[in-house]
Amino acid sequence: MAKKTQKDFLNPKELIKHIDIKKYSQAVSMVEDFSNMAYSSRDLARASKIYNMMLADKGCAVVLCLAGSLISAGLKKIVVDLLENNMIDAIVSTGANIVDQDFFEALGYKHYKGDQHNADDNLLRDLHIDRIYDTYINEDELKVCDETVHKILNTLEPRPYSSREIIWEMGKWLEAKKKGKDSIIYTAYKKGVPIFVPAFADCSAGFGFVAHQTERPTSHVTLDGAKDFLELTKIKINAKETGLLMFAGGVPKNFVQDTVVAAEILGQDSPMHKYAVQVTVADERDGALSGSTLKEASSWGKVSTALEQMVYAECTLAVPLITAYAYHKKAWKSRKGFNYIKFLQNDDAKIAKMKKQECCCCESKKSASKKAKKK
């Protein structure tokens, strides 16, 4: 029997393809019919309508939350279409979706259909093939992704950065290299939509950071997670209303919900998130946040209960329906994006100016002190 190679598993004819919601105008009538059914179908219909309400509310900033491995599963184009059509204003995600999967594909690499039932994971390991349930990835290509992040970090001024700033630099790099025009990172960069990855070191970017900081131990780029939280809180305070569109749970879900509490700590009267939709298969009974209900979040003062909906379904089934419904209802057509990248960059510029003024003031005091001593 011939020894198997990478080519036996990474078949160019068996690629994961990203679904195009623009093709499915019939999703509107289907989802509306779901309203007259029961169980998860009715929940999904209500969730779809709540998302459409977010888009129709001109003062509402929509934050998309992504957890798990959704981009490798074929949902990338949905997120890109939401960005292109001003249907989301900020993204909070796991690093896997943004770096290991979206940036990975922006470099020209692909995800392949696999076999979760008959996979020999020891053989896959020997062949440098990584498995995400029923999907395969070339590990050697993933290492190129790690190294590319490393190279980008080497070009930056050594200082603390929010993940949003690093991802913006990655978008800038893609533009310069003329790569990834169909990627989330590049599209968000082009549209002025910030992407936050609170656990940024927990992905390919983390390997890039390890290499960068080892190579430059005394002067390097660092991650400022508190700045991520502050920037997202500033968006919450700036927005008249906010809506959360959460696909899966995890850190992104809690991170954005907590901005209401953070705003309160800063003495700002910022209302609870007015709209909230979550698609998840997680169970609430273990006390973990991924499965905690949105009603539970209301007890913490984070989410209003009037317009919230949990949908207990796997994301690759529910997300195309919810987003296709909203896309073909066309409330987004009269909606303008908030360009929160510009908002945050302007804020950074003000802070930099304040620092410069403080520095000049300190230098003047030192100079005056030296003159006094000479006298």
UniProtKB/Swiss-Prot annotation:
Task: Extract the NCBIfam families matched here.
Answer: PRK02492.1 (NF002699)
Alphabetically list the UniProt keywords.
Transferase
Q: Does the record carry Transferase as a key word?
A: yes
Record flagged with keyword Transferase: yes
Assigned protein family:
Belongs to the deoxyhypusine synthase family.
Task: State the Pfam families in the record.
Answer: DS (PF01916)
Query: What organism is this sequence from?
Result: Elusimicrobium minutum (strain Pei191)
Q: What is this protein called?
A: Deoxyhypusine synthase-like protein
Q: Which InterPro entries match?
A: Deoxyhypusine_synthase, Deoxyhypusine_synthase-like, Deoxyhypusine_synthase_sf, DHS-like_NAD/FAD-binding_dom
Cellular-component GO terms for this entry: cytoplasm
Q: What is its EC number?
A: 2.5.-.-
Q: Single GO molecular-function term? A: deoxyhypusine synthase activity
